[in-house]
Amino acid sequence: MNRNEILFDRAKAIIPGGVNSPVRAFGSVGGVPRFIKKAEGAYVWDENGTRYTDYVGSWGPAIVGHAHPEVIEAMREAALGGLSFGAPTEGEIVIAEEIAKIMPSVERLRLVSSGTEATMTAIRLARGFTGRDKIIKFEGCYHGHSDSLLVKAGSGLLTFGNPSSAGVPADFTKHTLVLEYNNIAQLEEAFAQSGNDIACVILEPFVGNMNLVRPSEAFVKALRELTEKHGAVLIYDEVMTGFRVALGGAQSLHGITPDLTTMGKVIGGGMPLAAFGGRKDIMECISPLGGVYQAGTLSGNPIAVAAGLKTLEIIRREGFYENLTARTEQLVQGFRTAADAAGIEFTADSVGGMFGLYFAAHAPRNYADMARSNIDAFKRFFHGMLDRGIAFGPSAYEAGFVSAAHTPELIDETVAVAVEVFKAMAA
């Protein structure tokens, strides 16, 4: 047995499923997960000492590359002053101010420790602000593992959802309406039937949890118009897309001003840090100013804030996003060309430093489209690349990520490996 196998067996004896987040278990693709020993730049090394070019990027946060020396130094300096205080720090103010400069929709902001906390609290805040209970989410969008958001579509077009996890009471989900992404007619019908009862609409503005799905321009326009008309709060869940698809997030690309925004991943630079923010009148409903309660012992942790501030500084440097976008487009175009040459049904898409790979004729517009893609083909591709030293997320439903550490030459090397894998798949 190799080290990965030994560690997985050992982990399963004490950690449920052997992992601390389900996708890491390789359940969707089969095989043994790689236990990572270290990471630097665009690479990770497993416990066997095998090096992989990494397109997981810690599921998005590693936008400047792993263990960036400036980020590490900022964290080291912060750690010398103490690890956690349970009291306010100047760094919390600075990072909130910097985010507000980048995202004009954020008039007030609060730090938390995870994306789940951010979305859970944003939903609670929207309900408290509006005095309404019902929420709209979209099938295939993931917003963390809080109870009201672990909901899948009901049996009818506009029936309320069913729990997507054991342990979530069915009665608890009666206020959550699950609609099809990019379906304007469903959205209009939902507001026509229940508009005065809807507290908020939450969505991933580019969906990263059914690979990469783009919203249509008409869809985001309808979202903004309908929520404004009916007094519902529009929540952009930018935990994944914030500072990843563009400096100003998806909202800057859409030209949309959401009422609330949730963010995470990149803003922590690889450390546990997230936030929610938006309109002043809504945000001032949160305690201690208002009656909507939220708290956290480690919210605004000084080490995480230091990592986040340095990451935000780096990504604001001239040419950062132009280069990141160009490298990501180079990758997906190379994959498309390689698959076409091998006669494999495949397409790919990207926005900023985020990309999606689909074993289908066309990029998906919603969850049903993604579910019809060739998942078995993805599994073969995933293992073919992994065996040759290229790591993608172990699920056909997860987006991939490029960092500033991925050079054009490294992208070319990855594409060359993909050429081999596509040829082998076609044989």
From Swiss-Prot:
Query: Which Pfam families does its entry note?
Result: Aminotran_3
GO MF terms listed in the record are: glutamate-1-semialdehyde 2,1-aminomutase activity; pyridoxal phosphate binding; transaminase activity
Cell compartment(s), UniProt: Cytoplasm
**Where the protein is mainly located, per its record?**
cytoplasm
Give the E.C. number(s): 5.4.3.8
Q: Which CDD domains match?
A: OAT_like
Q: Which terms under GO biological process does the entry name? A: protoporphyrinogen IX biosynthetic process
Q: How does it assemble?
A: Homodimer.
Give me the Gene Ontology terms describing cellular component: cytoplasm
Q: In which pathway does it act?
A: Porphyrin-containing compound metabolism; protoporphyrin-IX biosynthesis; 5-aminolevulinate from L-glutamyl-tRNA(Glu): step 2/2
Q: Keywords, A to Z?
A: Cytoplasm, Isomerase, Porphyrin biosynthesis, Pyridoxal phosphate
Reactions that this protein is recorded to catalyse: (S)-4-amino-5-oxopentanoate = 5-aminolevulinate
Question: Per its UniProt record, what Gene3D superfamilies does this chain match?
Answer: Aspartate Aminotransferase, domain 1, Type I PLP-dependent aspartate aminotransferase-like (Major domain)
Q: Provide the protein name.
A: Glutamate-1-semialdehyde 2,1-aminomutase
User: Which residues does this entry mark as bearing N6-(pyridoxal phosphate)lysine?
Assistant: K265
Q: What cofactor is needed?
A: pyridoxal 5'-phosphate
Q: Which family does it belong to?
A: Belongs to the class-III pyridoxal-phosphate-dependent aminotransferase family. HemL subfamily.
